[in-house]
Each structure stands twice: as C-alpha cells, then as structure tokens.
Amino acid sequence: MAVFKGITPEQIDAICVGQYAGVDEVGRGPLIGNVVTAAVILDPHNPIVGLNDSKKLSEKKRELLFNQIQEKALSVSVGAATPAEIDEINILHATMMAMQRAVAGLSIKPTSVLVDGNRCPDFGMQSHAIIKGDGLIDAISAASIVAKVVRDREMEALAAQYPEYGFEKHKGYPTKAHFEALAKYGILAEHRKSFRPVREAM
C-alpha cells in the first residue's frame, strides 16, 4: 500500500489505470448509526460532470449526482458496520471492515482500490491511500457522495422514528442539540455505546 499526500496529476494518471475502484466512508464521528462506506468503479466512456468531495456539495447536488452515479457507473457497492460492531472492535477497525465489505460487493473485481485518507484495509489486491482523495479523484468523489446520501437517508429514517432527537438536522453528530436530546430522552439502541458522550448518558 502506498500513501499519497499532495499527489500530482502525473501520479494520479499513473495509479488510475484499468477498472479501479474509489472508496470512501461517511459517519465515523456521529454518536449513532452505522458507519457507511461505498466503492465505485466509474465508466471512463460515460463521464459524470460535477463530482467533488461530498462535503463541498449541496444536498440537492448530492442527490442529483447520486442518481447519475447509479445510472452511469460500471459498479457501485455500499458497505456498513453497525453500532454493535463499532462498539466491539472500535470505529477505526469497523470503518476498515465496512470498506472491505463495499469492495467485496462490487459486481466487477477492480484492478486496484483507491481509498480516501491515510490508510487502507487489506483488500487482497493493490491499493493506495490518497489524502484528500475525495477532492482529487472522481471515483473517490463518487464513493463519498454515495456513502453520504445513503447515511443521510438512514438518519432521516431514524428521525421519522424518533422525531424528538432531531437526527434530520445533525445527522447524529455530537452537536449541542444532540447532547440535549440525550440528556432529556436517554440513549437509543442505535447509539454507539463505546463513544464517551453516549456512555455518560447511560
């Protein structure tokens, strides 16, 4: 595994060969719900305009691109690790496991895997970690968008079930509103009990 920081266009060209998969995660920081990952193999002959780091896109733009990715990509797969798994093996290991699940779920076996960040799990094939890759490589950008939309939808479903917690607004992140809801209503089965603010509310 190679880790790239400040990657050059030439380095990108050198590693972006064949049917490579981009991988990213969403949801390491929240106090509740799954950590969600996605793996995407784009079609170089059917490009998608406007891909970028999901955090830099509006919700409307993410939804639009999400639909285009589903239509145009060669393969898209979503992985996740549950709160119970996060509590058992910790958030870092759970994230790596969810990434492995996303790649394993692809309908096409990729030639290599490019992961946003500074580390990769063992995919059983060539892989590269690319710092800030979600803003540099379209396949990683696409994965970040898919993971973000999927996790946000999970939080909206949870918000419909437990409206008093405001999950549709803070998406489970440790905000003042979330802390206040924990203090007032207590924890839910979906909360990550290994995270300190949740433990303290138990």
Curated annotation (Swiss-Prot):
Listed GO MF terms: manganese ion binding; RNA binding; RNA-DNA hybrid ribonuclease activity
A GO CC term assigned to this protein in UniProt: cytoplasm
Presence of keyword Metal-binding: yes
Main localization of the protein described in the UniProt heading: cytoplasm
BP-aspect Gene Ontology terms: DNA replication, removal of RNA primer; mismatch repair
Residues covered by the RNase H type-2 domain: 18-202
Coiled-coil portions: none
Keyword field: Cytoplasm, Endonuclease, Hydrolase, Manganese, Metal-binding, Nuclease
Cofactor(s) the record lists: Mn(2+); Mg(2+)
Entry's cofactor comment: Manganese or magnesium. Binds 1 divalent metal ion per monomer in the absence of substrate. May bind a second metal ion after substrate binding.
Family to which the UniProt record says this protein belongs: Belongs to the RNase HII family.
NCBIfam families listed in its UniProt record: PRK00015.1-1, PRK00015.1-3, PRK00015.1-4
Protein name: Ribonuclease HII
Gene encoding the protein: rnhB
